[in-house]
Curated annotation (Swiss-Prot):
UniProt source species: Rattus norvegicus (Rat)
Subunit architecture: Interacts with PTPN6/SHP-1 in a tyrosine phosphorylation dependent manner. Interacts with IL4R.
Alphabetical list of CDD domains matching this protein: IgV_pIgR_like (cd05716)
GO cellular component: plasma membrane
UniProt name for this protein: CMRF35-like molecule 1
Keywords recorded for this protein, A-Z: Cell membrane, Disulfide bond, Glycoprotein, Immunity, Immunoglobulin domain, Lipid-binding, Membrane, Phosphoprotein, Receptor, Signal, Transmembrane, Transmembrane helix
PANTHER family found in the cross-reference section: CMRF35-LIKE MOLECULE 1, POLYMERIC-IMMUNOGLOBULIN RECEPTOR
Membrane topology, Extracellular segments: 19-181
Gene expressing this chain: Cd300lf
Length: 332
């Protein structure tokens, strides 16, 4: 009977210590798939030299130990579960990494001792990976803010650039206008080309007017004498033709001597060549006619007829019949 009472007393003492210093911790923890979670379990100071463990199972008597300390503060890791005992703060920490959906269930914080171990039940739940994590949302907000700032900066730079362009030349490239440095050479080249064309047209008009007005007043018409051989007592045919070569020359003597002086200088400065068809008269035989056009205001030029072509000073042609003709330029 005394032994029974002693055993009952010892059991009561053991129960008092157990109720007084149990292992405590969170009743429920959760984590995200592919993430990690940490569980802190506290114990009494007199249990610091005992081994601590983390086990899984619905019943405390049949749970499976996943990781256990060696009664020291050294970190112990098994697979993706680790445990470390902090004997100064009387806590041991359990960390589960690379969580899977299959890791959800009932776990226990335990201390190994004689008899029944001290244990505390912890329910672990695993949540699927969120579609938009919190960190991603924060990053998105930051990116939007940065974009707004950059846009404002670009707008300011664009306005400043446009103002500079307006101040420098008044022509901006934003609206499709040409730069002033390109526009000025183009305008100058166009004006130069227009001036060249106008000058060419004016020169051609002046040249035509001079050509239509005839030779200058200081020039005279030279005469070339052509002889048609006389045919005595023979009626001239209709097809007997004589040609006269007329050329313009500078005068060298007075108007009265033009007939001889101009005939002797037939080789100087010929400008125009004209052919004149002359037919003999049926009434009387005229060998040739000499035509001399003088400038306005000058005396008429007289020319003699001869039977030979003469280009030098006139000579005595004998007793042949001589006829003179006076021709003046009509008044305009």
């Amino acid at each position: 009977m005394h032994l029974s009472l002693l055993a009952l007393f010892l059991f009561w003492i053991s129960g008092c210590f157990t109720a007084q210093d149990p292992v405590t911790g969170p009743e429920e923890v959760s984590g995200y798939e592919q993430g990690s979670l940490t569980v802190w379990c506290r114990y009494g100071s007199w249990w610091k030299d005992y081994s601590k463990y983390w086990c899984r199972g619905p019943k405390r008597s049949s749970c499976e130990i996943r990781v256990e300390t060696d009664a020291s503060e050294r970190l112990v890791k098994e697979n993706h579960v680790s445990i470390r005992d902090d004997q100064t703060n009387f806590t041991f920490t359990v960390t589960m990494e690379d969580l899977r959906m299959s890791d959800a269930g009932i776990y226990w914080c335990g201390i190994t001792k004689a008899g029944y171990d001290h244990m505390f039940k912890v329910h672990v739940s695993i949540n699927p990976v969120p579609t938009t994590p919190t960190t991603t949302s924060t990053t998105t907000i930051f990116t939007v803010t940065t974009t707004v700032k950059e846009t404002s900066t670009l707008s300011t730079q664009t306005s400043h650039y446009s103002d500079n362009r307006y101040d420098s030349g008044g022509v901006g490239d934003g609206n499709g206008f040409l730069d002033l440095s390109v526009l000025l050479p183009v305008i100058s080249a166009a004006l130069l080309l227009l001036l060249l064309v106008v000058s060419l047209i004016a020169w051609r008009m002046v040249r035509r007017q001079k050509k239509a007005a005839g030779p200058p007043s200081g020039q005279a018409d030279s005469v070339t004498h052509i002889l048609c051989p006389p045919k005595p007592h023979v009626q001239p045919l209709e097809d007997d033709l004589c040609y006269a070569n007329l050329s313009l020359q500078q005068p060298r003597t007075s108007p009265l001597k033009k007939g001889s002086s101009m005939s002797s200088s037939g080789k100087d400065h010929q400008e125009e060549v004209e052919y004149v068809t002359m037919a003999p008269f049926p009434r009387e035989e005229i060998s040739y006619a000499a035509l001399s056009l003088a400038s306005l205001g000058q005396e008429p030029t007289y020319s003699n007829t001869a039977c030979l072509v003469t280009h030098g000073p006139r000579t005595n042609l004998g007793e042949e019949t001589t006829e003179y003709s006076s021709i003046r330029r009509p008044m305009p």
